[in-house]
Amino acid sequence: MSESDAERIALVTGGASGIGWAIAQGLAGEGCRVTIADRNTDAATARAAELGRPHAAHTVDVTEESTVAALFDRVGPLDIVVNTAGFSNFGRIIEMPVEEFRAVVDVCLNGAFIVAKYAGRQLRDGGSLVSVTSLNARLAAPGMSAYSAAKAGLAMLTQVAALEFAPRHIRVNAVSPGFVHTPLTQAVTQVPAVLDDYLENTPLGRLGAPTDVADAVLFLCSAKASWLTGEVLDLNGGAHLKRYPDILAHLDRMASV
């Protein structure tokens, strides 16, 4: 980021762990004042304390509009909003309870919509909204119907928001990571057969680190990306060029991780 980014006000949802935490650290390191918002109050508070003042923490459930509205009201005007909140489950379409499908969509898509709704109101002119989609938005992943559908929806939501927010020069983009070393991917990456299959189909031959994603988000939030909006940036070592691992073949082993 450039010096002009110093003292910008940033909000990171899902910022207490994994990719969200790496992004919060990166923004703080670039001189932004960061609010970490997460369902896990204790974790968010601990992370904000780790960053030190003037950074802050707030509790939020992105599926509950009232808590998102209260969060944005308390934080005030913003320059950057990064939405990373999400989770996944696994199962065959014909066996998955509708409630489990809805739960993933509620967080990963509906929650992202609610965050975007209030970000569009609260961001200053020239601000930046970045969401985290997934490789699943591009490659069909048997066994991950809910997550894949939600993340594909988020990719299109990003482009629609980019058009709607453009009159105020608010840029809306997303990053689309592949497998990254985080708690979210643990159920997949700790099954050797799945991990080997994934790496064999990843041209750069490695998993991502949270900082790989954070670095891309920092760029999208910076003045260097001032002419970039509506972009969904593939960030997966080239995995989107090949195929997704066969999750269904290893469901039993994944459930035990």
Model feature map: region roles:
Residues 92-93, 100-105, 198:
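Substrate-binding pocket helix/loop in short-chain dehydrogenase/reductase
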Residues 94, 139-145, 167, 205, ...:
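Active-site loop immediately N-terminal to the catalytic Tyr-X3-Lys motif
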Residues 116, 150, 158:
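Active-site helix of classical SDR
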Residues 121-122, 163-167, 226:
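Alpha-helical segment proximal to the catalytic Tyr-Lys
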Residues 134:
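Residue(s) in the substrate-gating loop at a strand-loop-helix junction
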Residues 174, 193-228, 235-237:
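C-terminal helical subdomain
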Residues 229-257:
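Short C-terminal tail/terminal secondary-structure segment
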